[in-house]
Amino acid sequence: MKIGIIPGAGGTQRWARTAGKVRAMEAVLTGEPVRAVDAERMGLVNRVVPAGAQLEEAKRLAQQIATRPPLAVRLGKEAVNHAMEVGLAPGLEFERKLFYLLFASEDKREGMRAFLEKRPGRFTGR
């Protein structure tokens, strides 16, 4: 804004959807930078880590996700991404279909067995 343009690359659209219209409007019209702690509070970022620790934290998160059932991870990503493109009713219908698909998967059976046997699951993505 301070240099005669608005945020591009979807900035105005994503900001309004994530932080709300009022916060997005203030940020877009003033052009003032947002502090990391405020970005976290508004939901623009999911966590703030100390400077220099970003890669380590990203790897830790990736390793955690890698232990989860791959089919459920993939379909979970699809469900959340789909939610951003449609209204609530179609989003719930899409989620229900994915849930039923996962409920019939080998990974779900393995996950339930592993839980009952108090051991980590051995997931195959099927």
Where would I find each of the regions flagged by the language model?
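Crotonase-fold acyl-CoA enzyme core
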Residues: M1-V73, L101-S105, E110-R113, E117-R119, ...
